[in-house]
């Protein structure tokens, strides 16, 4: 009888300890868009064609010279490449047309919304001097941030490019600002 009571007491203690145990934290995996920034820009243009001759321009994140930092700021709006691992832009190759579509991939663990806010506040919509972008959107797709700016007189909308990239990514943006 004593053994039986001892076994019941031990089982009760074990069960109560298990019930008080900490639950495993459930973390949402960060969505990732497959492909390089260059590939993704080209696929986006296939989804939403433009009526001008444009091209993809990779951004060299390792160039810390004055020209390299100017290019980073001019394309992405960022002062530093510390929170991104890859960047590329799609812009017109000739003429003065206000259009720039930029994709950056954030480093693992970076807050993509904070990167997007820095891009939006840091970008110069008059970087072309004689023309200005008046339609600007920044959207987050997992670890990829998209900045699209253009002049609405062109007949295009920034939202149409966000929608095209959503088709390429395979999921809707987590945020659009």
Sequence positions of predicted segments:
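Soluble, non-membrane globular domain cores that form compact, hydrophobic packing
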Residues: 21-100, 106-177
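C-terminal motif of bacterial Sec signal peptides marking the signal peptidase cleavage site
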Residues: 15-19
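Sec-dependent signal peptide recognition
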Residues: 2-10
């Amino acid at each position: 009888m004593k053994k039986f009571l001892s076994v019941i007491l031990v089982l009760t203690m074990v069960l109560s300890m298990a019930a008080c145990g900490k639950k495993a934290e459930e973390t949402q995996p960060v969505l990732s868009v497959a492909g390089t920034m260059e590939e993704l820009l080209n696929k986006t243009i296939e989804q939403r064609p433009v009526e001008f001759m444009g091209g993809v321009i990779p951004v060299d994140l390792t160039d810390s010279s004055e020209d390299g930092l100017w290019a980073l700021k001019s394309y992405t709006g960022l002062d530093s490449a510390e929170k991104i691992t890859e960047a590329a832009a799609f812009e017109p190759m000739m003429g003065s047309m206000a259009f720039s579509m930029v994709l950056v991939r954030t480093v693992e663990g970076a807050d993509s919304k904070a990167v997007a806010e820095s891009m939006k506040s840091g970008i110069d919509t008059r970087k072309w001097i004689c023309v200005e972008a008046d339609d600007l959107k920044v959207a987050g797709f997992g670890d990829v941030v998209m900045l699209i700016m253009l002049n609405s007189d062109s007949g295009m909308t920034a939202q149409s490019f966000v929608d095209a990239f959503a088709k390429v990514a395979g999921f809707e943006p987590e945020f659009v600002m």
